[in-house]
Amino acid sequence: EACYPPGTFCGIKPGLCCSELCLPAVCVG
């Protein structure tokens, strides 16, 4: 499954971020 790049909304699923960080609801690099 593809991950989401920084700046992408991730809600409560930080594991879907390419950077694995979600703060607070957006993937961060």
UniProtKB/Swiss-Prot annotation:
Primary localization: secreted
Keywords, sorted A to Z: Amidation, Disulfide bond, Hydroxylation, Ion channel impairing toxin, Knottin, Neurotoxin, Presynaptic neurotoxin, Secreted, Toxin, Voltage-gated sodium channel impairing toxin
Cysteines paired by S-S bonds: C3-C18, C10-C22, C17-C27
Molecular function GO terms recorded: sodium channel inhibitor activity; toxin activity
Modified residues (4-hydroxyproline): P5, P6, P14
Location(s) in or outside the cell: Secreted
Tissue-specific expression: Expressed by the venom duct.
Cellular component annotations (GO), alphabetically ordered: extracellular region; host cell presynaptic membrane
Transmembrane segment boundaries: none
Keyword Membrane: no
Glycine amide carried by residues: G29
InterPro entries hit by this protein: Conotoxin_d-typ_CS (IPR012322)
Domain characteristics, as noted in the entry: The presence of a 'disulfide through disulfide knot' structurally defines this protein as a knottin. The cysteine framework is VI/VII (C-C-CC-C-C).
Family: Belongs to the conotoxin O1 superfamily.
Function: Delta-conotoxins bind to site 6 of voltage-gated sodium channels (Nav) and inhibit the inactivation process.
Protein name as annotated: Delta-conotoxin-like EVIB
Protein's organism: Conus ermineus (Agate cone)
